[in-house]
Amino acid sequence: MGKDFYKILGLERKASDDEIKKAYRKLALKYHPDKNKSPQAEERFKEIAEAYEVLSDKKKRDIFDNYGEDGLKGGQPGPDGGGQPGAYTYQFHGDPRATFAQFFGSSDPFGAFFTGGDNMFSGGQGGNTNEIFWNIGGDDMFAFNAQAPSRKRQQDPPIEHDLFVSLEEVDKGCIKKMKISRMATGSNGPYKEEKVLRITVKPGWKAGTKITFPQEGDSAPNKTPADIVFIIRDKPHSLFKREGIDLKYTAQISLKQALCGALVSVPTLQGSRIQVNPNHEIIKPTTTRRINGLGLPVPKEPSRRGDLIVSFDIKFPDTLAPSLQNQLSELLPN
């Protein structure tokens, strides 16, 4: 059963935006690890941040209300429909201090609010086509900024989003078009605008690779917009597992195939199949076969590739007839 973000913040499901902000402010200050030294404070602080991020964002909150945490993180369609599973997937960035700094306009509001200190958090950090929509900001994201003193133009912490790519996309490279919605400031005041950010995913890019778009976050008076950072993540694959530039595949074979040294047909990421074990050697549970050059491209040298590493899952029979057991006992060495 997934988390109940309303319960974490001590709210009813009909809570208003203002009540959500007040609950987060109270609990975040209470459980901030710099102030609260209890062993549970760190985990409680993280739960509170995640609950606020979901409930303060209308899109995330609508999905959570309809599908719960599992639906929110498992890729349910957005509240506007669209019919495509996986059209929106949320993953908490895992940094409750960044949420705290965004909300209060400071990584240390205790000093700013109570001692007059100036300790503001300063951010700053660089095929197939897909379009994904993210709402970058939110009307209440920086509700308490005006209360924190500042002597220079501050920048909000980077806004990070995971960008999931398939192994096929990593193999060939691809282009991702990410449509964002953000607040901008004009002569007539703030307004919402949409913009498409184009990301060229290079062949062989590793999970964890960061693509930074400087100052593409929400705009506000006397503040430098946050950088938007996309982080490459590997989509799970039905056949292969990635290990650096190598690919791992587990072939299912029978005990007969293993003992008789059968040829084993193995798929490749490119769609073809190859025959493994050409010398008809006995295949043991620990046996592996390495096929050179059938892995992923080396990021800085795409003409070079890693290897395809094949391991074997040998299926043993559940039962054997007594007569067959006797034959095997005679035939097989001790």
Swiss-Prot record:
The keyword RNA-binding appears for this protein: no
This entry carries the following GO cellular component terms, namely: cytosol
Q: List keywords of the entry alphabetically.
A: Chaperone, Cytoplasm, Phosphoprotein, Stress response
What InterPro entries does the annotation carry?
DnaJ_C, DnaJ_domain, DnaJ_domain_CS, DnaJ_subfamily_B, HSP40/DnaJ_pept-bd, J_dom_sf
Main location group:
cytoplasm
> What Pfam families does the record point to?
DnaJ, DnaJ_C
* GO MF, one annotated term: unfolded protein binding
The organism sits in which domain of life? Eukaryota
Cited SMART domains: DnaJ (SM00271)
Concerning Gene3D superfamilies, the annotation shows:
DnaJ domain, Urease metallochaperone UreE, N-terminal domain
Q: What induces it?
A: By heat shock.
A GO BP entry: protein stabilization
Domain J residues, every copy: 4-68
Query: What is the protein's given name?
Result: DnaJ protein homolog 1
Q: What species is this protein from?
A: Drosophila melanogaster (Fruit fly)
Please give the residue positions where the record annotates the modification Phosphoserine. 187
Q: Where does it reside?
A: Cytoplasm
